[in-house]
Amino acid sequence: ENERGRITIDGLDFNFTRKSAKKAKIQELLDRILLNSENAIVYCNTQGNAEKVAKDFDRAPLNTAFYKVFLDHLLRNFDPKWIVIEALQKGVGVHHGMVPKYIQKEIISLFNSPESGVRVLTSTTTITEGVNTTAKNMIVYKSEKGGGRYGKPLLTFDAKNIAGRAGRFMEHYTGRLITLDKEFMNVINDTGEQITHKNYDLNVEKKEIDDEMTPEQYLDDRSRERLLQIRAMQEARGIPDQILSQFKVISKRDKIKIYDNIAALSPLFHQRIKRFIARLNAPRMALEKDGFQVILDVIYEVVENETLKAMIENTFKDNYSPNHYSILFAALNSYLSTGFNGVYNYNLRRENNPNSSSAVNSAMRKTSSLIYNTFKYQLVKYIGVFNLMYKFYISERDRIPYEDATGIDVLLIKLEYNAFSEEARIASDYGVPQKIIDYYDSPNQNEANRIQGSFDGYEKTIFERINNIINK
């Protein structure tokens, strides 16, 4: 029904009179939904929009006693102007890929608890990735994934997946879908293209990386020729399948290029790598500039990610030598030395107005993207391949078993888990505050006791939970 801006959707009345802007429409929608004692997810196409919607929503002060311990933990460890904190103080959860995993989990738990008062969730597509919620209402901000030059229209499958988040988790018989972008309904009502897989379609042109995973009957002549070339290159170098088949996101040809680059290094450069590995395995792990630069030069030609490639290309002049080094070294060394907060503080100082909430949120997104995307995913996969090829080269050169060759495994483990011991890695995978991971990685019991004694109320609760899992 529609009479002068008044609309009824599934028994709920909304008044959009003189509310043409999205901000005003979302305010009206959420106000009415909350008055009806319901909850809602606002799907946003970007992290920035998810944060903006949370910031713009005006809500009366909320009694946060239910999650005071969690809120106190956030205030103790993060800037109070961070939108995740500001939003929670008014009962709104912000959920996207740049929010630390343990905070994402806690926000979903609060949203699913009626007594918490967290009744609104602003989110990107992370809400469709294995997350169950009690949402009654789904509001679509924009019918896209991403924004700017990286933005893509939602497919019918995506749209139905988003819409399907409303009325789930055995909580509601039906859900309510409301969209602020009419294109969303065009997409969701479309039959959509049949979902196909390039590995099972002879008519789809494949990249070299797809060839290995495509059944024989779906390969064209070009793919077959490439596979023969790769097999010949592999056999000429004697690289076993079990080594070349790891890190499937990088093509075998690129792995062989990395192997060839390692084999072509001079004795001086091999000595630098050896020194780099020795420093990694010292009691206090450290990055050695010259060896790390050799590794970056080895992998550079196969790196496809624009951000990582730029960080390798751009260099700085060393104060203590005539050499130039990749800024990736400086950034990674800073992270390993000072952690998330150290990188965040550096990024915040570079913002135009460091005291503003917009600067805080921008610095948090940049820091999270650098650590979680560039370091822990992009860099890990390339130096992971370097590690495979380097250890194989050393095992052949020195005629020792592959397992006895020393590589950069310590750095890979540190980047992937930020932890070394098995218990610490389990905790990291589960998603816990860093202090709990540090507890399990403690070099001795005295240090473990010191860290445990510094746990705040929230960390104590999570520690008990993960400790029960580890000690089962």
Q: What do these predicted regions represent?
A:
Residues 47-51, 104, 152-160:
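Amphipathic alpha-helical transducer elements in NTP-driven molecular machines
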